[in-house]
Amino acid sequence: MARISNAIGINPPIVIAVVGATGTGKSELSLALAEQIGGEIINADSMQFYRGMDIGTAKLTLAERRGIPHHLLDTLEIAEEASVARYQEQAREAIEDIQSRGLHPILVGGSGLYLRAALDVLEFPGTDPQLRRRLESELADSDIAKFRDRLRLVDSISEKRIGDEKRLVRALEVYELTGRPFSSFMPQREYVQPTFQIGLNGDRAGLHERLARRVHSMVEAGLPEEVAGLALRGLSDGKTASRALGYLQFLRTMSEPDYSRGQAAEDTIIATRQFARRQITWFTADPRVQWLDYASPELPALAKEMLSRF
Protein backbone atom coordinates (compact mmCIF):
# COMPACT_ATOMS: atom_id res chain seq x y z
CA MET A 1 0.00 0.00 0.00
CA ALA A 2 1.37 3.42 -0.90
CA ARG A 3 2.23 5.69 1.99
CA ILE A 4 0.14 8.85 2.21
CA SER A 5 1.40 11.83 4.18
CA ASN A 6 -0.83 12.74 7.11
CA ALA A 7 -3.45 10.16 6.10
CA ILE A 8 -5.17 10.40 9.50
CA GLY A 9 -5.63 14.14 9.25
CA ILE A 10 -3.34 15.16 12.14
CA ASN A 11 -1.31 18.26 11.39
CA PRO A 12 1.50 18.67 12.23
CA PRO A 13 2.37 14.96 12.24
CA ILE A 14 2.45 13.50 15.76
CA VAL A 15 4.95 11.10 17.28
CA ILE A 16 3.68 7.52 17.55
CA ALA A 17 5.27 4.82 19.70
CA VAL A 18 4.54 1.11 19.42
CA VAL A 19 5.59 -0.48 22.71
CA GLY A 20 5.28 -3.73 24.62
CA ALA A 21 7.06 -6.97 25.38
CA THR A 22 9.37 -8.74 23.00
CA GLY A 23 7.60 -11.06 20.57
CA THR A 24 4.26 -9.24 20.50
CA GLY A 25 4.49 -8.11 16.87
CA LYS A 26 5.55 -4.49 17.31
CA SER A 27 7.62 -4.43 14.12
CA GLU A 28 4.80 -5.74 11.93
CA LEU A 29 2.31 -3.26 13.36
CA SER A 30 4.72 -0.37 12.88
CA LEU A 31 5.18 -1.33 9.23
CA ALA A 32 1.43 -1.47 8.68
CA LEU A 33 0.94 1.93 10.33
CA ALA A 34 3.76 3.51 8.35
CA GLU A 35 2.16 2.30 5.12
CA GLN A 36 -1.36 3.35 6.07
CA ILE A 37 -0.82 6.76 7.65
CA GLY A 38 2.48 7.94 6.18
CA GLY A 39 5.38 7.36 8.51
CA GLU A 40 8.97 6.33 9.00
CA ILE A 41 10.27 4.06 11.74
CA ILE A 42 12.75 4.88 14.49
CA ASN A 43 14.31 1.92 16.29
CA ALA A 44 13.92 1.86 20.09
CA ASP A 45 15.46 -1.56 20.73
CA SER A 46 18.89 -1.00 22.26
CA MET A 47 20.27 -4.31 20.96
CA GLN A 48 19.35 -3.49 17.37
CA PHE A 49 21.86 -0.64 17.50
CA TYR A 50 24.64 -3.19 17.01
CA ARG A 51 25.97 -4.05 13.57
CA GLY A 52 25.92 -7.78 12.94
CA MET A 53 23.49 -8.59 15.73
CA ASP A 54 20.65 -9.46 13.41
CA ILE A 55 19.15 -12.89 13.97
CA GLY A 56 19.08 -12.81 17.76
CA THR A 57 17.56 -9.34 17.92
CA ALA A 58 14.89 -10.08 15.28
CA LYS A 59 16.16 -7.14 13.25
CA LEU A 60 14.16 -6.77 10.05
CA THR A 61 16.05 -7.41 6.84
CA LEU A 62 15.97 -4.79 4.09
CA ALA A 63 13.35 -6.84 2.24
CA GLU A 64 11.21 -7.16 5.38
CA ARG A 65 11.23 -3.37 5.82
CA ARG A 66 9.07 -3.10 2.68
CA GLY A 67 10.76 0.07 1.47
CA ILE A 68 9.94 2.03 4.63
CA PRO A 69 12.92 3.99 5.98
CA HIS A 70 14.20 2.76 9.34
CA HIS A 71 16.32 5.03 11.52
CA LEU A 72 18.88 4.21 14.24
CA LEU A 73 19.60 0.63 13.25
CA ASP A 74 23.23 -0.54 13.08
CA THR A 75 24.66 2.59 14.71
CA LEU A 76 27.21 0.90 16.99
CA GLU A 77 30.05 -1.59 16.79
CA ILE A 78 29.68 -4.50 19.18
CA ALA A 79 32.42 -3.30 21.55
CA GLU A 80 30.78 0.11 21.98
CA GLU A 81 28.53 0.85 24.93
CA ALA A 82 25.02 2.13 24.27
CA SER A 83 24.16 5.53 25.75
CA VAL A 84 20.65 6.67 26.61
CA ALA A 85 21.74 10.31 26.43
CA ARG A 86 23.20 9.86 22.96
CA TYR A 87 20.09 7.99 21.83
CA GLN A 88 17.90 10.83 23.05
CA GLU A 89 19.82 13.25 20.85
CA GLN A 90 19.74 10.98 17.80
CA ALA A 91 16.08 10.02 18.17
CA ARG A 92 14.92 13.61 18.53
CA GLU A 93 16.94 14.60 15.47
CA ALA A 94 15.27 11.79 13.51
CA ILE A 95 11.83 12.82 14.79
CA GLU A 96 12.37 16.40 13.66
CA ASP A 97 13.64 15.28 10.26
CA ILE A 98 10.68 12.97 9.63
CA GLN A 99 8.13 15.57 10.72
CA SER A 100 9.76 18.20 8.52
CA ARG A 101 8.78 16.03 5.54
CA GLY A 102 5.15 15.78 6.66
CA LEU A 103 5.39 12.21 7.94
CA HIS A 104 4.73 10.59 11.32
CA PRO A 105 7.76 9.34 13.28
CA ILE A 106 6.94 5.85 14.59
CA LEU A 107 9.18 4.68 17.42
CA VAL A 108 9.13 0.92 17.88
CA GLY A 109 10.83 -1.21 20.50
CA GLY A 110 10.82 -2.51 24.01
CA SER A 111 13.71 -0.64 25.61
CA GLY A 112 11.68 1.38 28.09
CA LEU A 113 14.22 3.94 29.25
CA TYR A 114 15.32 4.69 25.68
CA LEU A 115 11.71 5.33 24.70
CA ARG A 116 11.19 7.59 27.70
CA ALA A 117 14.35 9.50 26.81
CA ALA A 118 13.06 10.15 23.29
CA LEU A 119 9.46 10.94 24.20
CA ASP A 120 9.50 12.55 27.64
CA VAL A 121 11.05 15.49 29.45
CA LEU A 122 14.29 13.95 30.72
CA GLU A 123 17.57 15.66 31.59
CA PHE A 124 20.94 13.94 31.63
CA PRO A 125 23.45 15.36 34.13
CA GLY A 126 27.04 15.64 32.99
CA THR A 127 29.95 13.45 33.98
CA ASP A 128 33.38 14.13 35.44
CA PRO A 129 35.80 11.21 34.97
CA GLN A 130 38.25 12.61 37.53
CA LEU A 131 35.54 12.99 40.16
CA ARG A 132 34.23 9.51 39.40
CA ARG A 133 37.69 7.98 39.81
CA ARG A 134 38.06 9.74 43.17
CA LEU A 135 34.72 8.41 44.37
CA GLU A 136 35.56 4.90 43.17
CA SER A 137 38.85 5.08 45.05
CA GLU A 138 37.09 6.29 48.19
CA LEU A 139 34.62 3.42 47.94
CA ALA A 140 37.45 0.90 47.52
CA ASP A 141 39.14 2.25 50.66
CA SER A 142 35.90 2.31 52.64
CA ASP A 143 32.81 0.10 52.50
CA ILE A 144 29.49 0.28 50.73
CA ALA A 145 27.50 0.82 53.94
CA LYS A 146 29.31 4.10 54.64
CA PHE A 147 28.76 5.20 51.04
CA ARG A 148 25.08 4.42 51.39
CA ASP A 149 24.91 6.55 54.53
CA ARG A 150 26.60 9.35 52.62
CA LEU A 151 24.08 9.16 49.77
CA ARG A 152 21.15 8.87 52.16
CA LEU A 153 21.98 12.28 53.63
CA VAL A 154 21.59 14.01 50.25
CA ASP A 155 19.28 11.70 48.26
CA SER A 156 17.30 9.19 50.29
CA ILE A 157 15.15 8.27 47.26
CA SER A 158 18.13 7.09 45.21
CA GLU A 159 19.69 5.35 48.21
CA LYS A 160 16.59 3.17 48.52
CA ARG A 161 16.49 2.35 44.80
CA ILE A 162 20.16 1.70 44.07
CA GLY A 163 21.51 -1.80 44.54
CA ASP A 164 24.95 -1.77 42.92
CA GLU A 165 28.21 0.07 43.50
CA LYS A 166 28.42 1.58 40.00
CA ARG A 167 25.11 3.43 40.33
CA LEU A 168 25.92 4.41 43.91
CA VAL A 169 29.07 6.16 42.72
CA ARG A 170 27.13 7.76 39.86
CA ALA A 171 24.49 9.15 42.22
CA LEU A 172 27.14 10.78 44.42
CA GLU A 173 28.97 12.06 41.33
CA VAL A 174 25.81 13.77 40.08
CA TYR A 175 25.14 15.36 43.45
CA GLU A 176 28.68 16.74 43.74
CA LEU A 177 28.56 18.04 40.15
CA THR A 178 25.13 19.65 40.23
CA GLY A 179 24.09 20.09 43.85
CA ARG A 180 20.88 18.25 42.94
CA PRO A 181 19.82 14.75 43.98
CA PHE A 182 20.27 12.11 41.31
CA SER A 183 16.60 11.22 41.75
CA SER A 184 15.59 14.70 40.55
CA PHE A 185 16.81 13.78 37.07
CA MET A 186 14.47 10.80 36.75
CA PRO A 187 12.06 11.04 33.79
CA GLN A 188 8.68 12.67 34.27
CA ARG A 189 5.58 11.44 32.45
CA GLU A 190 5.45 14.60 30.36
CA TYR A 191 5.77 14.38 26.59
CA VAL A 192 8.16 16.72 24.81
CA GLN A 193 5.55 17.04 22.05
CA PRO A 194 2.17 15.44 21.20
CA THR A 195 2.63 11.67 21.27
CA PHE A 196 0.41 8.59 21.04
CA GLN A 197 1.62 5.31 22.55
CA ILE A 198 0.14 2.01 21.39
CA GLY A 199 0.93 -0.96 23.60
CA LEU A 200 0.67 -4.62 22.61
CA ASN A 201 -0.26 -7.12 25.30
CA GLY A 202 -2.46 -10.17 25.69
CA ASP A 203 -2.55 -13.79 26.76
CA ARG A 204 0.60 -14.51 28.77
CA ALA A 205 0.64 -18.26 28.11
CA GLY A 206 0.29 -17.63 24.40
CA LEU A 207 3.18 -15.18 24.51
CA HIS A 208 5.37 -17.70 26.33
CA GLU A 209 4.74 -20.27 23.61
CA ARG A 210 5.40 -17.68 20.92
CA LEU A 211 8.72 -16.75 22.53
CA ALA A 212 9.83 -20.39 22.68
CA ARG A 213 9.05 -20.86 18.99
CA ARG A 214 10.86 -17.65 18.20
CA VAL A 215 14.06 -18.72 19.94
CA HIS A 216 14.05 -22.12 18.20
CA SER A 217 13.51 -20.35 14.86
CA MET A 218 16.48 -18.08 15.57
CA VAL A 219 18.68 -21.09 16.30
CA GLU A 220 17.59 -22.76 13.06
CA ALA A 221 18.22 -19.50 11.18
CA GLY A 222 21.85 -19.45 12.33
CA LEU A 223 22.04 -17.67 15.69
CA PRO A 224 24.91 -19.88 16.98
CA GLU A 225 26.92 -19.14 13.84
CA GLU A 226 26.13 -15.43 14.12
CA VAL A 227 27.42 -15.41 17.70
CA ALA A 228 30.57 -17.28 16.69
CA GLY A 229 31.29 -14.72 13.99
CA LEU A 230 30.72 -11.82 16.36
CA ALA A 231 33.00 -13.45 18.95
CA LEU A 232 35.84 -13.07 16.46
CA ARG A 233 35.05 -9.34 16.33
CA GLY A 234 35.19 -8.92 20.10
CA LEU A 235 31.64 -9.62 21.26
CA SER A 236 32.88 -10.75 24.68
CA ASP A 237 34.44 -7.31 25.21
CA GLY A 238 31.19 -5.46 24.56
CA LYS A 239 29.72 -4.50 27.93
CA THR A 240 26.24 -4.08 26.48
CA ALA A 241 26.20 -6.36 23.44
CA SER A 242 27.60 -9.41 25.23
CA ARG A 243 24.64 -9.39 27.65
CA ALA A 244 22.00 -9.54 24.90
CA LEU A 245 19.46 -12.36 25.05
CA GLY A 246 20.75 -15.36 23.13
CA TYR A 247 24.20 -13.88 22.60
CA LEU A 248 25.13 -14.29 26.27
CA GLN A 249 23.95 -17.90 26.29
CA PHE A 250 25.57 -18.97 23.02
CA LEU A 251 28.85 -17.30 23.95
CA ARG A 252 28.96 -19.74 26.87
CA THR A 253 28.89 -22.69 24.47
CA MET A 254 32.21 -21.49 23.07
CA SER A 255 34.00 -21.35 26.43
CA GLU A 256 32.27 -24.18 28.32
CA PRO A 257 32.45 -27.56 26.53
CA ASP A 258 29.76 -29.09 28.76
CA TYR A 259 27.28 -26.31 27.99
CA SER A 260 25.37 -27.47 24.91
CA ARG A 261 23.52 -25.54 22.25
CA GLY A 262 20.32 -27.16 23.43
CA GLN A 263 20.88 -25.86 26.95
CA ALA A 264 21.75 -22.42 25.57
CA ALA A 265 18.46 -22.37 23.66
CA GLU A 266 16.45 -23.39 26.73
CA ASP A 267 18.20 -20.80 28.90
CA THR A 268 17.53 -18.17 26.24
CA ILE A 269 13.82 -19.03 26.31
CA ILE A 270 13.73 -18.70 30.10
CA ALA A 271 15.63 -15.40 30.05
CA THR A 272 13.43 -14.03 27.26
CA ARG A 273 10.25 -14.83 29.17
CA GLN A 274 11.66 -13.15 32.28
CA PHE A 275 12.61 -10.11 30.21
CA ALA A 276 9.12 -9.96 28.70
CA ARG A 277 7.61 -9.90 32.19
CA ARG A 278 9.82 -6.96 33.15
CA GLN A 279 8.83 -5.12 29.98
CA ILE A 280 5.13 -5.68 30.68
CA THR A 281 5.59 -4.32 34.21
CA TRP A 282 7.40 -1.25 32.88
CA PHE A 283 4.93 -0.35 30.16
CA THR A 284 1.72 -1.14 32.07
CA ALA A 285 2.87 1.31 34.75
CA ASP A 286 2.46 4.15 32.22
CA PRO A 287 -1.22 5.21 32.15
CA ARG A 288 -0.73 6.99 28.82
CA VAL A 289 -0.28 3.75 26.85
CA GLN A 290 -3.36 2.62 24.90
CA TRP A 291 -3.46 -1.18 24.82
CA LEU A 292 -4.41 -3.62 22.08
CA ASP A 293 -4.39 -7.43 21.99
CA TYR A 294 -1.31 -8.54 20.08
CA ALA A 295 -3.21 -11.58 18.73
CA SER A 296 -6.07 -9.59 17.18
CA PRO A 297 -6.41 -10.19 13.42
CA GLU A 298 -7.67 -6.60 13.11
CA LEU A 299 -4.66 -5.07 14.84
CA PRO A 300 -3.62 -2.50 12.18
CA ALA A 301 -7.21 -1.32 11.68
CA LEU A 302 -7.77 -1.01 15.43
CA ALA A 303 -4.55 0.96 15.86
CA LYS A 304 -5.44 3.30 13.01
CA GLU A 305 -8.90 3.84 14.50
CA MET A 306 -7.35 4.75 17.86
CA LEU A 307 -5.06 7.25 16.16
CA SER A 308 -7.93 8.84 14.26
CA ARG A 309 -9.51 9.75 17.62
CA PHE A 310 -6.36 11.49 18.87
From Swiss-Prot:
Assigned keywords, A-Z: ATP-binding, Magnesium, Nucleotide-binding, Transferase, tRNA processing
UniProt cross-references to InterPro entries, sorted A to Z: Dimethylallyltransferase, IPT, P-loop_NTPase
Cofactor(s) required for function per UniProt: Mg(2+)
Superkingdom of source: Bacteria
Positions bearing the site annotation: Interaction with substrate tRNA: 111, 132
EC code: 2.5.1.75
Reaction equations catalysed: adenosine(37) in tRNA + dimethylallyl diphosphate = N(6)-dimethylallyladenosine(37) in tRNA + diphosphate
Region feature Interaction with substrate tRNA, mapped onto this chain: 45-48
GO biological process, one term: tRNA modification
GO molecular function: ATP binding; tRNA dimethylallyltransferase activity
Ligand binding (substrate): 22-27
The protein's role, per its UniProt record: Catalyzes the transfer of a dimethylallyl group onto the adenine at position 37 in tRNAs that read codons beginning with uridine, leading to the formation of N6-(dimethylallyl)adenosine (i(6)A).
Family note: Belongs to the IPP transferase family.
Assembly information from the UniProt record: Monomer.
Protein name as catalogued: tRNA dimethylallyltransferase
Species this protein is from: Renibacterium salmoninarum (strain ATCC 33209 / DSM 20767 / JCM 11484 / NBRC 15589 / NCIMB 2235)
Gene: miaA
